[in-house]
Amino acid sequence: MLKFIQNNREGTALLAILTLFALLGIIDRNYFSLQTFTMIFSSAQILILLAIGATLVMLTRNIDVSVGSITGLCAVTVGMALNAGFGLAASCLFALLVGMVAGFFNGILVTWLRIPAIVATLGTLGLYRGLMLLLTGGKWIEGLPADLKSLSTPILFSISPIGWLTMLLILAMAWLLGKTAFGRSFYATGDNLQGARQLGVRTDSLRIFAFSMNGVMAALAGIVFASQIGFIPNQTGNGLEMKAIAACVLGGISLLGGTGTIIGAILGAFLLTQIDSVLVLLRLPAWWNDFIAGLVLLGVLVFDGRLRCAVERNIRQQKYARFTAQAIISDKKPTVSDNNPAASNKKKAAL
């Protein structure tokens, strides 16, 4: 059972989502509907985008805790560009470029300067957050044009253009990681860095690419945030890094690298957003969200560690049982002297 759970984390996350839907559907019949599903998906888009980027980084056995600050910085970038008179496309491209540069800088710190990822990105967390506040003077950005808000307006099947783009990104990343040699390089790098290098994988370039794409996903999340609420607070992105990591771990992405799928991370993000919707349904204050996210992350990490130890212990017991069985069988095999009485008599005569 434990081995099944470890090898099917995506299925476990999906089962948890369906179970929560069923329980809430019993409590409130209006909850179990297509409208509720699309509403949760719309709310989950920011976390899904962050989980996509975090997956790439975590698969290479790294971590990025600056994505919340990058999200806020890029949201401010697109807002300031729009208010300065730039078009929507140019403003979004500028924000994506800022996110890519921020992620690239993280990758340089980790890969070339050999700074541990947690230390490097803790530093850039404060750096990017401070830059965001310097640009805004600590003020909110308001008066955003309607063009930006149209990105989150439902157009087809109650899903917005950003929603459709998010689904395309999910499919593209699932194909990249699961069906291409380049995608498998992420797993090889996280599983065994030296072994991947011997196989010809350009591990430094790959890790820099992972951090850069993480920055792009954070920038896209910042654009989605600005389009959904129509203004940009000075605390935009706070705490999102913890939720992104929690979503990935919940969906089966290992902090030790080399394990997990993008689908699992997406399901983890959806489950966390669903839990937030439960808090709204129960009319609990909004500050419970971070508490629940931290509690879920801690619980999943503890469970994941205990599960891994239990599975390894079970594997060792099975190996020991097979070794013992083989030893017993070899002891019971008849010797040459047992099968040949003449050889046994000659041996006795020699003695």
Curated annotation (Swiss-Prot):
GO CC annotations?
plasma membrane
Residue ranges annotated as transmembrane are 14-34, 39-59, 70-90, 93-113, 115-135, 155-175, 213-233, 252-272, 284-304
Q: Does the keyword Lipoprotein apply?
A: no
Source organism of the structure: Yersinia pestis
Determine the domain of life of the protein's source.
Bacteria
Which UniProt keywords are given for this protein, alphabetically ordered? Cell inner membrane, Cell membrane, Membrane, Transmembrane, Transmembrane helix, Transport
**Signal peptide range in chain numbering:** none
The listed locations are: Cell inner membrane
What is the protein's known function? Part of the ABC transporter complex LsrABCD involved in autoinducer 2 (AI-2) import. Probably responsible for the translocation of the substrate across the membrane.
Name of the protein in its database record = Autoinducer 2 import system permease protein LsrC
Keyword Transmembrane in the entry? The reply is: yes
Give the record's membrane topology.
Answer: Multi-pass membrane protein
What molecular function terms (GO) are annotated for this protein? transmembrane transporter activity
Q: How does it assemble?
A: The complex is composed of two ATP-binding proteins (LsrA), two transmembrane proteins (LsrC and LsrD) and a solute-binding protein (LsrB).
Give the main localization category. Answer: membrane
Q: Which InterPro entries match?
A: ABC_transp_permease (IPR001851)
Family according to the record: Belongs to the binding-protein-dependent transport system permease family. AraH/RbsC subfamily.
